[in-house]
Each structure stands twice: as C-alpha cells, then as structure tokens.
Regions:
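Hydrophobic alpha-helical transmembrane segments of multi-pass integral membrane proteins
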Residues: 1-152
Length: 152
C-alpha cells in the first residue's frame, strides 16, 4: 500500500536553496575566495531567490484554489494545474544555468553578459508562469459559482 512520492518541480527550488545556503556558509566560513562575489551570488541568487521562487510557486496556486473554493466554485483546477509543471521545470533550469554563469563570470569576466541575459529570461519566465495562474483565476471568477454544466 506504499504510494510512490509525487514529483514536484517546486521542490527543486527548495533543494537548490538549501544546497546554496550550505555552500555559501562553507565559502564564508573558510574564506575560500579573495572576493565576496561568489559568496554573494550563491547566497543571494542560489539561496534567497530560489527560496522565494519556490515559495511563490506554492503560494499562488494554493491561494487561487482556496479563494475560488471558499466562494463556492465546483469546477476548479487542482493546485498543481494552476501553473503547468513543464514551465516550472524550464524556468528552474534557466535559473540554475544563470547562477552557474554568474559564478563562472568570476573566472571569465565576459560571461557576466550571458549570465545577466539568462537571469533576465529566468525572471520573464517566472513572471509569465505567475501571470498564467492569475489569468486562470480571473477566467474562473467570470463564471457562475454554481455552474454544474461540466458534471452532465
């Protein structure tokens, strides 16, 4: 009767965040680099920003579902359907690659431009994913809560 764990891309953000926190603590504790550039990137973008994005990807769908459910709507997408998992994965990999490029730009200065563009693309994807969830919420609120035509 043991169920397999359900895959959740938002947990990747949490894992990246906690890994980055540990790595940044090691960098800080042992003063591994003469500059604090890598420490700043790993802590700010790897830990804080990844944590924030992972939380937002959980909060927006839950609040959308909760508010619609409390208003009496019957035909609702599940919490996992408010933001398509495949777009969360794409965003995660672009975000991760941008962090890697920021770190590599410490050693090769010209990579800072690629890192910045990737980070910008990552944020645009994040905005689009959140906006799509809001659009689904608005589309559902324009219907009648007691509309049971989908159950015929």
């Amino acid at each position: 009767n043991r169920r397999r764990p359900v895959f959740d891309a938002t947990l990747w953000y949490w894992k990246l965040s906690l890994s980055s926190l540990i790595i940044s603590m090691i960098i800080w504790l042992f003063n591994l680099f003469e500059s604090n550039y890598i420490l700043s990137i790993v802590f700010a973008f790897g830990f804080l920003y990844s944590l924030l994005q992972g939380m937002v990807y959980k909060i927006i769908p839950f609040l959308s579902w909760f508010h619609l459910s409390s208003k009496g709507y019957f035909k609702l997408p599940t919490i996992r359907e408010f933001i398509d998992e495949k777009y969360i994965k794409i965003h995660f990999f672009v975000h991760l690659i941008s962090i890697v490029f920021f770190i590599l730009s410490y050693f090769e200065n010209n990579l800072i431009y690629s890192a910045s563009i990737l980070f910008l693309i990552s944020n645009i994807l994040f905005f689009i994913n959140c906006l799509n969830a809001v659009k689904k919420y608005i589309a559902i609120t324009k219907t009648a809560p007691m509309d049971l035509s989908a159950f015929k």
